[in-house]
Swiss-Prot record:
Keywords: Cell inner membrane, Cell membrane, Membrane, NAD, Quinone, Translocase, Transmembrane, Transmembrane helix, Transport. The chain crosses the membrane at residues 7-27, 63-83, 90-110. Belongs to the complex I subunit 3 family. The gene is nuoA. It is a multi-pass membrane protein. NDH-1 shuttles electrons from NADH, via FMN and iron-sulfur (Fe-S) centers, to quinones in the respiratory chain. The immediate electron acceptor for the enzyme in this species is believed to be a menaquinone. Couples the redox reaction to proton translocation (for every two electrons transferred, four hydrogen ions are translocated across the cytoplasmic membrane), and thus conserves the redox energy in a proton gradient. It is an enzyme of class 7 (translocase). The keyword Transmembrane applies. This is NADH-quinone oxidoreductase subunit A. It is found in: Cell inner membrane.
Amino acid sequence: MDQTLSGFGTVFVFLVLGIVFVVGGYLTARMLRPSRPNPEKNSTYECGEHAVGSAWVKFNIRFYVVALIFIIFDVEVVFLYPWATVFKQLGAFALVEVLIFVGILVLGLVYAWVKGDLDWVRPTPNIPKMPEMPVRRSGKANG
């Protein structure tokens, strides 16, 4: 038990020292740097060209959906690699667990596919237009 605590203590000291170095470097640079703001420094740098318009560019939300799906399956590979290296020692139970894991991810992919998140060009819906609101025989509309 004493070795376990010393192992966690080492990790904790390493974490604290890492945070101290990052925060200390940031604060030292902040205190030592000169502060002379001007419009040239505050403008967006575009390879020597004068900035035209805003630096903010609107992206289609589909980029983010595809990126999230990619990250999910990329992390899946990270989880499957250690399993694949020790598959023979783990046995059939580990195989069933991995098949369930992959099955859940495949269900998520099928859901995204059926929902249309993977279709880059979505068809525009055909909404029927009514010429005017139906009127009752009495002449009053919905009354």
